[in-house]
């Protein structure tokens, strides 16, 4: 819980610097200015790319990130203090960033993307999507960690029945999404993408 709270109180610039400072010998780190950061697993020929974004609606609305006093803790649930000046708590997408960082720390042999400015149209994933650092030939799927709820697998028209079945067999429910970095990247090479629930609710509101 403390690690997630530490991510929630960072603005996009601070979080970008935090992720950029991470060094793990099991990954190649690539930094694309104004795009984001990729971690590519060493000695792996095929892997999914798990996608997260570093901004929140607070950045979009020019509001500050929450401070410690802005965050209410009730058991395993975090929410925004109703007296806060923030636009949202920021679980979208700090929950996804938290999950990705945990997986990197566990040396899971997937690729990970941390993208800038998703909330204003996927600016960061567009820049990385057309850059030379994106190893499209090795990527099996784009998997977003950027969906509300706890049991949704969102589709965007770049579908793989086999990939969807993996999550439906685990109890996930298929829904249709509108936009996320994973779908933004899928358009470049027509690679399958999905977006998975990461545990936030009421995104983009003070009730998050």
For each feature predicted by the language model, list its residue ranges.
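A non-catalytic alpha/beta surface segment that caps or lines the substrate-entry region
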Residues: 2-45
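Short glycine-aspartate micro-motif
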Residues: 47-51, 140-144, 193-195
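Zn-dependent metallopeptidase/amidohydrolase metal-coordination segment
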Residues: 173-208
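Short amphipathic alpha-helices and their capping/turn segments at secondary-structure boundaries
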Residues: 36-43, 49, 129-134
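Active-site metal-coordination/substrate-binding segment of hydrolases
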Residues: 31, 42-109
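Short, acidic Gly/Pro/Ser/Thr-rich loop/turn segments
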Residues: 57-59, 120, 150-152, 201-203
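Hydrophobic anchor at the start of a short beta-strand
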Residues: 25-30, 47-48, 110, 172, ...
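Acidic/histidine-rich catalytic neighborhood of metal-dependent amide-processing enzymes
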Residues: 85-167, 174-175, 182
